[in-house]
Amino acid sequence: TPSYYEENEDGIVPDLRLFDGNFTKPAIPYIRDGFAHMKNLSVYGSTRFKLTDRLALIGGGRFVDWQYRYSSNRNNFADSRHKNKVFIPYLGASYDLNDNLTAYTSYTTIFRPQPRYLDRNGKPLEPQRGKTYELGLKASGFEGRLNASAAAFINKRDHLGKEIRDDEHQRIYYESVNNTTTKGVELSVGGRLSDKWLINASYAYSKLKNDAGNLVNPSYPAHLFKLFTAYDVTDRLNLGANVNWQSGTNAVSDEYQPLTAAGKEALTQRSYATLDLTAHYKIGKSTRIGLDFENVFNKRYRPMPDIHVYGTPRSLTATLKHTF
């Protein structure tokens, strides 16, 4: 017998222990939930001035005409309209310290619409606005086969969307947070150490805080490290490894207070690392077989600390590819 499930705004799931598989099809009338209309027109340009053999200035910008209208019948949400005409400048400078090392700095403003972030009244939040400052180094080696970079940045934004859980009404909405500051560092190296050895590694650190110095989104990791390497053992056989590591995260906030030790643990994901291995072998010119061993140590983790869905467990995938 066919069975159905009625989705409603209460978000109540029937007790599965009492469900016998037989449920009458509900009479659900078609109701238009609402509509959204967005228009985004932009014009951009850039130029570069070589002041000396080593010093260069870069300037540019983008003019944006962004319009958005949103209306929803759900929960009697009101009609919402946004119109913005914004110029986003970009300024930068670079200086060649030597043939293989360049220092740079840059400045730009931020305009980032967020039409999917609705406030408690069902209206989209104002676009994010702010400024970004960056300072860094770029280097090359091994006759241009290997590139590396290091950068530090400061990002200041207003109207940043913060997720709020409304358990009473079974919904999620967002509120704007102003005067936020993100400080971070990014390091990367990639290329070939030899004709047979490929490597790509990166590290990123960032923390987003409000004007009181508190973390705004602790559910995102402050530290991320990624390493991929592959080596041609022979002309036919290639072996690779991929490592991903991130620092701990949590979803503990005032919304869940008072919170027991067990509750805090349930909303916390400790730091973790995963390892993937690959092997690919060429059979002739047109055929290749491959083995992909994902999450070798079967690490159990949650990508988001407040969503109790675990990441991909240990798995082995074999592929056969032939090109005609």
Feature locations, PLM:
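Membrane-embedded beta-strand positions of outer-membrane beta-barrel proteins
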Residues: 47, 59, 91, 105, ...
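Gram-negative outer-membrane beta-barrel transporters
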Residues: 53, 154-156, 175-256, 285-288, ...
